[in-house]
Amino acid sequence: VALAENATVNGVTFLFGHNVGDVLTEDGKVTGVITDHGIIKAPYVINAAGVYADDIAKMAGDQFYTIHGRKGTIAIMDKAKVPSYPRLVSQLTPEYHKGKNVESKGGGMHPTPHMNLLLGPSATEVPDKEDNSTTKKDLDYTMTCNQDPNVTSADVIRIFAGVRPADFKEDFIVEMSELTDGFVHVAAIQSPGLASAPAIAKRV
């Protein structure tokens, strides 16, 4: 929120609920986008569309990657059960230890500033890019991330899920388009995307 407020102070205008239908180009250069609220002219378009980044790239004539959904589920514990470990605790799966290309490093335990303990996330491939449903299987996985003997599944107060924009190369895509001038790819951003955000913004 603080970053968004800072951006607003520095002249950024946020347009929420504007769905992009096409990317406008002329002579191989971006000129703007067509949205369901009209045309927005722009000399640059930064494609940070998450799970739909490949669709936007296709509109700009430069789709060289395919995004597939990978759902992650996180369980929130009751803050009445104070975590025994006040810091981040991560675990690595046996497959990751063996150097195999796995969908998840393993998840972990994440205490919030309010001392709610977060467990997870899981990593499940899903065909629907907007599948934010939660399942018992995913909840069971998040509980395997628990290393705190004082915390049990009875302490879960909420479960939520989101879909990561995974690329088949399992790496971030942050680069200028080689085919369409003014078009910038910021795609396939997974973990540690939040921690990387300032560096990604600086590079872009």
Regions found by a protein language model. Name each.
Residues A2, S104, P113-H114, E125, ...:
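C-terminal catalytic lobe of FAD-dependent flavoproteins
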Residues H18, G50-V51, P198:
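Alpha-helix N-cap/helix-start capping motif
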Residues T13, Q63-I67, T152-D155:
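A short alpha-helix-loop-beta-strand transition element characteristic
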Residues V23-K29, I34-S133, T144:
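Flavin-dependent oxidoreductases
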Residues G21-L24, I157:
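Conserved positions in beta-strands of structured domains
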Residues V1-G11:
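Rossmann-like flavin
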Residues F14-F16, T35, N47, L119, ...:
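General beta-strand structural signal in soluble alpha/beta enzymes
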Residues N10-V20:
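A conserved beta-strand/loop element that lines the FAD pocket in flavoprotein oxidoreductases
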